[in-house]
Amino acid sequence: MMTADFLVSDPSSALTPAASTPALRFTSGGETLQGILHIPAGPGPHPIVVVLHGFPGNERNFDLAQALRRAGYAALVFHYRGSWGMGGTWSWGHVLEDAAQVTAAIRTDEIAGAHRLDPRRLALVGHSLGGFTALMTAADDLTIGAVASVSGFNFGAVTPTFTDPAVRRGYVEAFEEELLPLRGTSGEALVAEMEAAGDAWSLARLAPRLADRPVLLVGTSRDTATPHEIHHEPLVRAYEAHPVPRLEHHVFPSDHALSDHRVALARTVIDFLDRRLAVAE
């Protein structure tokens, strides 16, 4: 564990190898995905954090990735299919598939061995759609050591409201406004995909499969995209009721992107990982 304050202190120049930021390529669904790996200074092997961005990915949390690196974690940020210049088409299902593929690939000997990574210690940290994806991916992969959802979007809490035509239309229109960096989809297609998935995308149902892992949920009280009364508080209650014994949860007085709580977010996430992912640096 690093002893200096990772938010204001660069690593010692005596640490070797030096920190680096290589671009990586992953394959998912026949398409090539671009990733940026933030490798800490020092011999490692370094624990891995895959940082999952939201829809469409305006906030990609590179500041969090840099803070994670200074704290001793190798942080990966990547783009899903059909987003930000990547090939293929965007869909919620493709996001889930891409996250699973990348999470597996980063731990292979080819990548982990080449970049001083510890494949035995991996966490997922996601924002918004990325929070949903982090929890869903961790529930399906028992080897993921810890998971954090920040302003997570709970599809299962929203889809039942689509029986109201006005609500459904509102989501179609809201999604349409965010499609510029995405390809091959529409607001109607995204809402229809949510309806087809139904309760299978309810995050509350994941409690039994997350009960043996540390889980961090961060809500935001000034959030109009994922209001904490809908997306955060009910999920906390569901995970406490099951229970998920190593659940930690917070609500920050901030907007969806935590625009004025970036330092607090970094400290909260890294404190959680330091205690729960057993960093041994």
Predicted regions and their residues:
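N-terminal cap/lid segment of alpha/beta-hydrolase-fold proteins
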Residues: 2-44
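Short beta-strand element of the alpha/beta-hydrolase
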Residues: 45-54
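Serine-hydrolase catalytic-loop signature spanning alpha/beta hydrolases and amidase-signature enzymes
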Residues: 54-60, 75
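Conserved alpha/beta-hydrolase
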Residues: 65-87
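Alpha/beta-hydrolase active-site loop
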Residues: 90-115
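Alpha/beta-hydrolase fold nucleophile elbow
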Residues: 113-128
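Hydrolase active-site cap/lid region
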Residues: 136-189, 213, 228
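Serine-hydrolase catalytic core
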Residues: 187-274
